[in-house]
Amino acid sequence: QLSKYCGEDKAMELMDQVITNFKRFHPKPEEVQCSNPEAEPDFIKPYFGLRLFPVWHVGTDYLSEIAKNWYDYLVSKGVQFHWETKVTSINFRHNEVIMHSVKPEFATMDNDSIFYDELIFAVGKSGIDFAQELANHYQLPDEPKSVQIGVRFEAPQKHFQKLIDVSYDFKLYRKFEDKGVSLRSFCTNNNAAYVAVEETYGDHSYNGHAKKDMRYRNDMTNFGILMEINGIEDPFAWSREVVNKLQFNGTGLYYSPTRIPSSTSEGNDVSAFQIDNLSGVENVMGEYWTYIMDFIEDMKKVFPTLQDDWGIYIPEVKYLSPEPLVNYRNLSLTKFANVHFVGDALSARGITVSGAQAIYVAEDILSYYLRDTEYPEFISHYVA
């Protein structure tokens, strides 16, 4: 996804910079772990392929400390943060960001504005709707994205240890190009692995994370089984409708032949309504549900001890709105050369890719504005 803009070599360099930054602000950088398989093991064939590229694990335990250290550094360098402030609109034509305080005591006050020379619009998942509002308002040309939907699979780690020894964050995949469908395992967590609930648009979906602190060790493995489905007319609306239909009693679903939902790292039950059969899920997902179940059945062949010792949390989803067309040199909008879309605004999947996109944009902006400087080391320092 990043390499289409800047090529494979540059994409890897940018992602290395992201990891370097995480290590820089990590309280224990030596605990950042890399999984980098070099060859596909024979025992997964012919059922699956294994994606061969490095994956880094920072550790959920440390994210708040990393964020605090990073924040303190940015403040020390003069970066201003506007807390408890909502951006209500952006005028791309007049270079104006319009915002309003969400503090109750300021509720009746007028909007405030910030004017910009260059704007990096880098929202997360909660900002997808706002990004789409802007895209619609300014009639930004775009290209449709695929549907990304599936389940969060969980089982005792012992069943997958043979593959974990090859690749901690293994990514099994298979493709059905004639059907426009591909599947992959996604975001594997081991050792102290927990399923997490995400709430978006009022609906529950699932993800996973792993603790580094071995006090949390539960010897479980969880990962997403995600389908990438092409050819659906409105992928974003389709995904939201399917996720909404897969809710019951205000939460998502859980199915297992033998197990019950696990607990969170805090010792609470993972919010999910347990169902005793999958007929309702199949009715909602239609023919696509067969791909998920075939994936699980073939895992039982590759990992023979697995059998019925597993459970799935339904659904896992990655909402991808249409991707605005941007200039490849700096991810600026084709209609507004000083507005750069990054992260979920550009349908990025994952924090590493989002961070790499931001660095890519920052490098270009700094190189342009400092192109006439007499101090090339200044550019070198701040671009790095």
Where in the sequence are the language-model features?
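N-terminal FAD cofactor-binding segment of flavoenzymes
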Residues: 1-39
